[in-house]
């Protein structure tokens, strides 16, 4: 009886264990199947673009302002999603300035002679003629080398020889010292009259231009410098420079500005603007 009773109970126990294991396996299989199905969109979203309310926003091209966004997207910008309108970068608008840049305040916009309200005193007019003695001296020396002008200038040597001899006896550094003192001490200082400073820098520019022409001509072959071309060239240069210097001296004595093309503009730009 005991063995007969124990046998069905053992069978029932084993069958119940088998039922529990089979039901557990079925439940585990259903759970795994459910988890696999539920995790599938997550895996897809991890490989693709994540579902976000920002994907619903319309794409705004570069340069389009934020006011063109739709009404539905404005809720995301100012609603409960975190106020994203403040996080979007807004580039500042550049305003074009109409002011023209200037290199220096001393450079005038146009080259015009100041109005002569009254005639300068006679001593200022006399001093304004002195800077032209240097280019006149150089012009006379180059004119004497010209074949056509030498016979004519020989009659006036007694007038020019004392001055030319005095200039020739000066030391070699005199011209350099003269230019530095005249430019820094007179031209660039506003204490002197504008009329006097203008004629000082005019004489300096005429002297420098003539020295440059003489230096460049010495680099030419001797056949050109002493030939027929050089003879006509120095005759033309001597006539042009002689009349230019004499016209400048006449304007200085008359109390006027010498209106020499190109040279007067170059002289006026060297003077600080008042």
Curated annotation (Swiss-Prot):
Gene Ontology molecular-function annotations: protein transmembrane transporter activity
Phenotype upon loss of function: Albino and seedling lethality. Tic20-I and tic20-IV double mutant is embryo lethal.
Entry keyword set: Chloroplast, Membrane, Plastid, Plastid inner membrane, Protein transport, Transit peptide, Transmembrane, Transmembrane helix, Transport
Tissue distribution: Expressed in leaves, shoots and roots. High expression in mature photosynthetic tissues. Lower levels in non-photosynthetic tissues and roots.
Range annotated as the organelle transit peptide: 1-65
GO cellular component: chloroplast inner membrane
Membrane topology label: Multi-pass membrane protein
Protein's UniProt keywords contain Magnesium: no
GO annotation terms (biological process): protein import into chloroplast stroma
Pfam hit, one: TIC20
Locations listed in the record: Plastid, Chloroplast inner membrane
Residues passing through the membrane, by range: 130-152, 167-187, 200-220, 229-249
Principal cellular location given in the protein's record: plastid
Domain of life from the UniProt record: Eukaryota
UniProt similarity note: Belongs to the Tic20 family.
Protein purpose: Involved in protein precursor import into chloroplasts. May be part of an intermediate translocation complex acting as a protein-conducting channel at the inner envelope. Seems to be specific for photosynthesis-related pre-proteins. Partially redundant with TIC20-IV, but not with TIC20-II or TIC20-V.
Alphabetized NCBIfam families for the sequence: 3a0901s05TIC20
Quaternary structure and partners: Part of the Tic complex. Component of the 1-MD complex, composed of TIC20-I, TIC214, TIC100 and TIC56. Interacts with the translocating preproteins. Hydrolysis of ATP is essential for the formation of this complex. The 1-MD complex interacts with TIC21.
Name of the protein in its database record: Protein TIC 20-I, chloroplastic
Species of origin: Arabidopsis thaliana
